[in-house]
């Protein structure tokens, strides 16, 4: 048998591997040690490399192809500092710690598997089912019911519900099904005196809150009476509750204990969107129908053909109310939009910055390299010469329209001059502009004509037929400039508002919250400068606070509303008539990539069915409406008809965990395979293997104690594991900040070329380098992008501590920072609430918030927690081969975003400054986006499986006299260290993971975590010692001492910043202040503006504290009494001397007869900028000498100053 295995089976398996696509493969540990040599010899004969590795104490053979970059050529060395050795020895010498044999026994016998009876479940307190009380509808309630579009079909709906247990009610959003259906069912059960309990399932908590509140308002009651709600952190249910709203995710968590008892009707909304938890719930409902014969299921949909749902259940009826509208809205696509804007001759944007000198481009290393790329291409003109430039455009974010510093030529100029038509087509496809002129006033067209390059002339003539340049038509680019152009088209051109003045509400659909915040600032800045008609801005996005939604619902009908929304708008039935819709037609989708084993945030075009649903929000039957889609007609025709379900593309870690808690005895792949949208089997396999890797599932696919605790924490399993390590190492606050930052957009992300407005396109490299310098400054030589998150949040937190948010604008970056920090703070609060609900944070004792943050000021402890939490995303630097190696990804590169590398800098140059070869990171596909260098001891201590025994320690093969040993942390992480060091590290590791196990298993036992409890006191000694050890290790490898990270125990941070700012500058506020009795016809060119400059003497705060509004009014009254009307605005500009700075610009107005200054913008702008602008535009220069308290200035100068404040770019003008 041995002969057959060694001579036939092993060579056959290696040949299969050689013919396959894998670059490496691990062969199972069922082979005997004697056969390892056979593997090595056969692999060597086939040109393969092999290595014996250890997995959970068992020897395995791993075989690599020559091109495989996972292979660790040699182990990384671990040498402890003297201070770490002393502290570790002192810790292990304590009598209270277990000995080596006890630790081995502990690792072998203690199971991490949670018993089925111990699995946490949520109890949904459903009162016993009974008939509702007899009551009669009031006239107002009857009018409310008859206003529903489906009221005339009530009898048909009820007959269908009695005829079949499952019905699919298919109707547009305006039918308001999730409120109407429960009321109809309740009324019927009340008349028939039958038992009823209606559970209404939404896909998000904000939808459940909104619909439940509206239903309760119908009864004139509070939530918790007839209508209730069940959410993770808010519950209102009583014995008299008959309609309960919840989310699919929360309801699933209660099924293990509740099993559809005391429910007569289940109404599931938005099934067409295929929310992953809704799809799983449908599987549970299908199984429950066999044992709950009286259960009635109503599926609410908005899709063209809902037959797939009745096919899935094998029974049911369809009520399809979606019909082709009689009057369709006018739909305009990208090409038509550009033509209309070009014909309209819209004039927007700041004049003052259009001719800004390009002094910012000088003495920049990246500019020098880009100049060399263009120069080489101009001299050679070959494909190889163009390739470095294209690399810079595609990977290092250089603009495709980059101009040579001396000649002003772009790559398009050179391609036209050299008659490289294929290069020209490629550059134009990438968004290059052929109309840019160089220093000799030549563009690509004139150069091609001058040199008689007819092939290039044909390409350019074909391109020029459109009469405009389309900047980009990719789903990952949102053209904010085009959206602003459309706003100008709608607000300032009378031909788009025929007849009586009727501006109409505007709905703008954007892919993410980040895009909402950015566009919010751009619209505000254009409105405050008087260029756009004033309006009220409202925001709707996923997981928003209810205050944002109520602000829109309660807004006056006379208010002109501009609503910026994500795709949540497809589920919100709002009583707001929209006249115009601007749809970016794209969405952000997290797609799991099987080749890199990671999720990738990818922007995609939405499907045609989603565009149709958005179009129907306009309700064309109520008047002339128009839809603008920022996608070309050709791209629209190529879109898929229906959206792909999320289960088939997303990362499945939380889904697999939810399935295992629902059905502990079912294999995850089998369960997901019978859902209505089964995911690819390879995705499920990768997710299960990953969960086993990080100890969420054990080898038998059972849920561990870690998995039990992570289920209800609203982050991915890996980020949840990082929170657990933050709790264990008592540095929770910075870990909370890092986890929350990774869950939202990065305010200091390096922007792509297309993400920069047209106005600043020439300064793309300068902007990117400025942001890079800011990241370097915030990292403070810590070689960590995660440290930037902590420091940025702390600096913002210190500025905002116990203060109301500023209700003036500074610049776009500050506005976006405040908006993103608002979202980050909200995510932090939600995570903390979930940790409390999971009993991982207590109100007192060793797990109190104060105690869990005793190490939050120590960055070395935070890095240790990052190492344990980010495992297995650990990379090793191979400086000899200038590559990064990991267990998962082969070809990996560092994204320009990370502080571990500079732009266009090879890895071997960056790695020279690295203090350690180990990197923990967050990655997307083949890019390391955020990384932190960590000491080898942290990798040895916290990576790998929690139950590693001493058996992975093997004698070193370097020499017989060598006293070092090899330690295999997992199948890839391989270290060499002295035998004494190995034993100390492994024993300390065991002691730490004993604490890890005790926390996860016993965190609900409050008595165990009292301050005077003996085992817990030992854990305090452990973390205190670890802090000293890692502090010593950081100094030993050469890390700089980090700046102190302050911990604010009870920060009172401002919330709802964007809501406050938008309300402060809203048109509704003007109406409330009795400024207007009704909207006036608006044309920005006919508004009279007066500008006064006032000498402040100090900063703005000093000026406003020293001078009352009455005094300011008297100063202005020396020239003219400030009378502010809709067509006459008074602005006050504050300035100071030494240094000469303009400080702010405010609007003088009367509120109910009282004079006040409403501050619009505040910034520090050098006076010389306006003086230079006045000279270049031949405008009389104002005097800023400080001798006069106030002065009236030319309105042209005032407009320029206004633009200086409104359109100032933080990174270009930062001083």
UniProtKB/Swiss-Prot annotation:
Keywords annotated in UniProt: ANK repeat, Developmental protein, Differentiation, Oogenesis, Phosphoprotein, Spermatogenesis
Task of the protein: Forms a complex with tut and bam involved in 3'UTR-dependent post-transcriptional repression of several 3'-RNA processing factors, which promotes germline stem cell lineage differentiation and mitosis-to-meiosis transition. Part of a complex with bam involved in 3'-UTR-dependent translational repression of a subset of mRNAs, including those for mei-P26, nanos and shg/E-cadherin; may act as a promiscuous RNA-binding protein tethering bam to its target mRNAs. Required for regulating the progression of gonialblast cells through transit amplification and differentiation into gametes.
Mutant lacking the gene: phenotype: Flies exhibit abnormal cysts undergoing transit amplification containing an excess number of cells that do not differentiate into gametes.
Quaternary structure, from the entry: Part of a complex composed of at least mei-P26, bam, bgcn and Sxl; this complex is involved in translational repression of nanos mRNA. Interacts with bam (via C-terminus); the interaction is direct. Interacts with mei-P26; the interaction is direct and does not require bam. Weakly interacts with wh/wuho; this interaction may be required for the function or formation of the mei-P26-bgcn-bam-Sxl complex. Part of a complex composed of at least tut, bam and bgcn; complex formation does not require RNA. Interacts with tut; the interaction is indirect and is mediated by bam.
ANK repeats by residue range: 407-439
Gene transcribed to yield this protein: bgcn
Tissues showing expression: Expressed in testis and in 5-8 germline stem cells of ovaries, immediately adjacent to terminal filament. Expressed in ovarian germline cells throughout the germarium (at protein level).
Modified residues (Phosphothreonine): 898
Name of the protein in its database record: Protein benign gonial cell neoplasm
Record keyword Transcription regulation present: no
An annotated GO BP: cell competition in a multicellular organism
A single MF term (Gene Ontology): RNA binding
